[in-house]
């Protein structure tokens, strides 16, 4: 999402997208705040993985989920599957000493098995406000025993966010942004409110063009036309990557303000 990098910096973007991290300690424990042995970690959640690398602890990771595609080194790690369709066997197959688990991961039965295992897990609540960005960095840092580095990173991101807020305060009217998660077979799945994408749009000074629902849903042509986005933001990497040329084959998107101006960012 290069538009975010230009507005608030890569650090802020990764933190906004971060969901929560949870480590389950003993056999019947739910979560812990700090992992004693961080030598072999599994990270589930793209932003959590980015934070780990930003803290200089990427060498501790042995596996990641499919949403963890940045930085490039992360893609070389063992892939344990999509964060919402994890299998306990896949996660535990790499013999982790700790699991960084984003809130929203699942399914529930997998989480129950992981919590009953002897591998520590830590859960960080998923939120997308400026305040929660800083809290997530600090919580990941605490989980890894890297509090000082986390404090420094949080300070950098805080400055980026303040800069972004100053920039966005001068934007009038604010750009209407449509985040498209996928466009498989011409069917547009886009972000409503209550998502990491919505949080990024807001922090970057934009307005989500879709505010009629929470989460991700398929849009009708009428809904796309009504959204009238000034900017279309899409996935640039991974299995859900969407190409600009493919989007412009959709006549409704092509005729939108973003389509007419070619204002499509991956």
Question: How does the language model describe each region?
Answer:
Residues 45, 103-104, 126, 213, ...:
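Short secondary-structure boundary segments
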Residues 34-40, 109-185, 210-212, 262-266:
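Extracytoplasmic substrate-binding proteins
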Residues 65, 191-216, 236, 261:
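His/Asp/Glu-enriched short active-site or ligand-binding loop at hydrolase and phosphoryl-transfer sites
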Residues 2-15:
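Bacterial N-terminal signal peptides that target proteins for export
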């Amino acid at each position: 999402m290069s538009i975010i990098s230009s507005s608030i910096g890569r650090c802020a973007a990764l933190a906004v997208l971060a969901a929560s991290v949870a480590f389950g300690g003993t056999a019947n424990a739910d979560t812990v705040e700090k992992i004693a042995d961080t030598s072999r970690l599994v990270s589930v959640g793209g932003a959590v993985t980015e934070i780990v690398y930003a803290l200089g602890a990427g060498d501790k990771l042995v596996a990641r989920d499919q949403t963890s595609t940045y930085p490039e080194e992360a893609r070389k790690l063992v892939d344990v599957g999509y964060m919402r369709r994890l299998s306990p066997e896949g996660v535990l197959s790499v013999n982790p000493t700790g699991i960084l688990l984003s809130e929203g991961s699942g399914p529930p039965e997998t989480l129950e098995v992981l919590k009953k295992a002897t591998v520590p897990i830590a859960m960080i609540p998923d939120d997308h406000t400026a305040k929660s960005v800083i809290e997530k960095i600090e919580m990941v840092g605490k989980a890894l025993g890297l509090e000082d580095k986390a404090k420094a990173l949080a300070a950098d991101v805080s400055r980026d966010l303040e800069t972004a807020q100053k920039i966005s305060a001068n934007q009038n009217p604010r750009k209407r942004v449509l985040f498209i998660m996928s466009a498989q077979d011409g069917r547009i799945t886009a972000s409503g409110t209550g998502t990491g994408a919505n949080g990024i749009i807001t922090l970057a000074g934009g307005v989500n063009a879709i505010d009629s629902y929470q989460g991700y849903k398929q849009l009708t042509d009428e809904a796309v036309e009504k959204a009238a986005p000034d900017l279309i933001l899409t996935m640039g990497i991974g299995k859900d990557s969407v190409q600009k040329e493919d989007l412009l084959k959709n006549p409704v998107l092509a005729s939108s303000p973003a389509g007419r101006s070619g204002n499509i960012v991956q």
